C-alpha cells in the first residue's frame, strides 16, 4: 500500500514537472534562464527558455526508466540471495522510494530553472543523502533476509 502511494507521488511530481515546464515555456517570452549554478548557489551560465523542455523530457525519461524498465533486481546486489520471496518486496520498496526522491529532486530543479523557487544546493545534497541512505538501509535489510 505504501509503495503504491509513493509511486503515485512520483507520477504526480513528474506530471507537475512537465506542467511547469510547458507553462513556463508557453507563458514567457524568449528570456535567458539559469542553466548552470556554482557551489555558492548563484547562476553563472544562462540558456534560452526552450532549454526547460529537454530538462523536463529528461525527467520523464528517467521516471519511466526507473519505474517501468525490466530489471534483474537480484543481479545488482553485492551478495547472493536465495530467499527471493522475502527479498523481492524490499527491492520493490527500495526502487519506489529511490524513484520518488529522484523525481522530487528533478521537479525542484525544474522549478528553479523556471525561477519559481531559488535553487539551494544544500537541499539537493540532502535529497541525495536521503537517496543513498534509503538504498543502504534497504540493502542491509535485503542482506539480512537473503538466506
Regions found by a protein language model. Give the residues of each.
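Active-site and channel-lining beta-strand-loop segments
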Residues: 21-53
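Alpha-helical transmembrane segments and their helix-start/interface "positive-inside/aromatic belt" motifs
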Residues: 1-14
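Cytoplasmic juxtamembrane regions at transmembrane-helix boundaries
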Residues: 71-94
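Hydrophobic alpha-helical transmembrane segments of multi-pass integral membrane proteins
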Residues: 14-24, 57-62, 66, 96-110
Amino acid at each position: 500500500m505504501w509503495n503504491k502511494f509513493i509511486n503515485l507521488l512520483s507520477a504526480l511530481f513528474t506530471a507537475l514537472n512537465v506542467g511547469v515546464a510547458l507553462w513556463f515555456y508557453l507563458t514567457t517570452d524568449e528570456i535567458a534562464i539559469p542553466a548552470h549554478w556554482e557551489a555558492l548557489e548563484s547562476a553563472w551560465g544562462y540558456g534560452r527558455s526552450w532549454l526547460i523542455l529537454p530538462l523536463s523530457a529528461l525527467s520523464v525519461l528517467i521516471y519511466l526508466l526507473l519505474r517501468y524498465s525490466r530489471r534483474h533486481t537480484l543481479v545488482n546486489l553485492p551478495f547472493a540471495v536465495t530467499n527471493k520471496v522475502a527479498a523481492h518486496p524490499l527491492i520493490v520498496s527500495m526502487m519506489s522510494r529511490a524513484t520518488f526522491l529522484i523525481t522530487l529532486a528533478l521537479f525542484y530543479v525544474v522549478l528553479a530553472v523556471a525561477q519559481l523557487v531559488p535553487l539551494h544546493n544544500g537541499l539537493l545534497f540532502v535529497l541525495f543523502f536521503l537517496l543513498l541512505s534509503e538504498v543502504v538501509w534497504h540493502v542491509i535489510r535485503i542482506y539480512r533476509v537473503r538466506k
